[in-house]
Amino acid sequence: MNEIDQIYNRISENTNTFLGYPLAKDFSYKEFAPFLDLCINNVGDPESDSTLAIDTKDQERECISFFADILSSNTKDTWGYVTNGGTEGNLYGLYLARESYPDAVVYYSESTHYSVKKNLHLLNINNIVVRSQDNGEMDYDDLEQILMLRRDKPAIFFLNIGTTMTEAVDKLDEVKRIIKKYAIKDYYIHCDAAFLGTIAPFVTPKPKFDFSEGVDSIAISGHKFIGGPIPCGIVMVKRKHRDRIANSVSYVGTLDTTITGSRNGLTPLFLWAFIKKHGKEGLKNRVKESQELAAYLEMELNKIGVKAWRNNEALTVVLEKPSKEICKKYQLASEENIAHVICMPGIKKEQLNVFLEDLKKELAEILCALV
């Protein structure tokens, strides 16, 4: 067996067993294999063609139009591009917020993804961490107490639409209530919908986080629920914010509006292929199947004596942290005394049953040791 086969087999085997990360497993893009022999570069703004004509910008624009639609907007009022992932999308949203309000303070909960602190450091923005509730949602009383002392300063609200560990959703209505109560006139709302951006539009009741609710920017992961071999994301913003930072670059013949200059041209192709094949109805069915799987796992875990719970209609099942051996075998993300299983497309009930049997054995061994 050569080294390349060894690498492939290791990754393939580990892909089959993981349960703790939000990555779909049921995709195949084999028909795009010939593209691996090409350098595809979507340099610059997706809406303007470059002097470098080896891109997939037509397909990228179709993707952006699709996401504008499911986020209750259109490409006249909003603009976006395919990013390298959720972190870049959050960086871009915070960058636009800073350009709008250079003296603002960013408010975000302690359950926010670790990369956001790094983004805030890179952008050198003043920020304050807000406490979280037990379910991972922002503590609005704490936000109110903090904001009350800073009501005269511009504010940037960084809201989580599905936290990393518990899939908690910060309530936009609560934040808007506080904004109104303290008459904050200069503010910007960014939503980190890395995981739920492709799920929440099809959940009942639908979380409030899109452009119809007055948000300014939204970051979404493209490779998680949709699935794909290369990490990617989508960032959507109000067009007026993008226009504020746009610069023309003559030698590439396009506008400079994105974080990176050279941009991956393969990932828009994968997203475009998924959208063409499945559309909104396909995403809706995908969400329903994953929710049913999560409900099954939550019920079965509690049946065998493992305390488990979910936020409303979540795909993330939070459970008491199992042994190191089980966490390693199933690649479970854990924090303090909890771990989680995320019921993504491609995970089958049979795999969950094997996981449940392993937990049963572990519980039986613990009971025997106590006798």
Model feature map: region roles:
Residues Q6, K117, N247-T258, E281-V371:
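Conserved C-terminal alpha-helix-loop-beta "cap" of PLP-dependent enzymes
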